[in-house]
Amino acid sequence: MNTLKDIKIKNIKYYHTDDIIGLKLSQFKSCTNGRRLISNLNIDDNNYIFATNKSGKWIETDGKSRKFDKVLIKVSWIKENILDDDENDNENDNENDVENENDVENENDDENENDDDDDENDDDDDEIIMAPGIIKLNKNEKIRDDKNKIVDIEVRGTRDPRNCFFKASDVSKGFGMKNLSDTISRSSGYKLGIHYRYFYLQKNTDSIRKKNKIKKIKKIYLTYEGLLRVMFVSKNDRVSRFIMWATNTLFTAHLGTKEQKNMLSSKLMGITTDIVKEVFNKTSSTLPTLYLFTIGKVKDLRVTLDIGEEYDDECIVAKGGETIDLTRRIDEHTESYGKMPGAKLLLKSYNYIDPQYTSKAETDLFQVLKKMNYIFKHPKYKEIIIYTKKESDLITKEFSKIARDYTGHIKEISDKLKCFENQYNIMKLEYEKEIANKEKEIMQLEKENSDLKYQNEIIELKYKNKLLEKDRKIAKLEKNIKKSGLK
């Protein structure tokens, strides 16, 4: 990458994505701009910034302006992931080719040694494919060690237990498991394809770029089942926190009470579909409803739904509509939208409407959304809308407003249902408050008990001291009596 000019911001060097795309390397072929490049390569947020050039000086920005905010990628990331050594330009092609091929072999050896990967396995290399894209995890999703510190593990694939892979060398390093890759690939307890897989990672060198060839580096990745096996058979204390979390979660999902399962579900974002389904099963699942599901963010669904660059990565993708059976519709959308790569299906809002107005309410709603330019046209999926995070409240209010206009004869029922829900929430808050007060009382009693125990210990010590003092006096008197008797 010696042909690129670096940009220094806050003592960190970056490359301009326009310059990188200008190299016309094979891995950038489908990248039309910087934002598309970081999306296609799944570059982590920590390895790029948005910046604008003002009077010849680059200043970091928030990236909101697609016209002026440019994407800059760290030089260190480019050198690590898009290797391009250009040190021997003055030598002839044959010498250059031989030297670079040797460098490839040495680099391969070094990486295998450092990453603790095992390339001596005799599996069929023809069956090994290129590594899938990186999955970006939030802080709550990342694995932690026994000291509650995040362990950085590269995760690739999709959010599917059968297609999610964890880099073995990161697990080895993060939990101090030496020679983990050797153990996995050579132990009969780990099965290729079930507990682990090999993937190729791509890096380009100068000679390879000239020949339009790809250097493939084979790495070992654990499946989710393989990761669990490694954790549960390990005697390393650093995995104890993960094992406890996995055990408690699995137990609650399998054998937990309804209350425990609801508590587990409540930790998720928004209103989970399972809880809503449970509520509707207990009331009336056939009451006509206007609903709004959020499917996920544009950055996670851009490829799946072929969303254009005019939409920002942080925009929200949602599905609106009406139904006479919300429980059934939840199941349907979970099967269709919920299983999309990158989707996180949540029920954002729902409002009851009069059965005689169901179709008209939906028509009016989408006419309003169309005028506000929120409708996203897709050849397969209908009633999709896209809006910014700031517009979330506005969208919810529009749904509620249309629903109020068509409540009709069920207004009384609708109000009662909403009233019951509010009462439930109030009772829940009061219960939680009562529990908190009880816990405070218990803590106060424990403190008082501790104080009493301390006071009793002091009194006991004083009593023992008095007894000792009396014993000394008695001993002294007896001694004096004996002396008097001798005289």
From Swiss-Prot:
Keywords, sorted A to Z: Coiled coil
Recorded family membership: Belongs to the mimivirus L5 family.
Superkingdom, natural source: Viruses
Region annotated Disordered, chain positions: 84-125
Coiled coil: 410-485
Protein name (database record): Uncharacterized protein L12
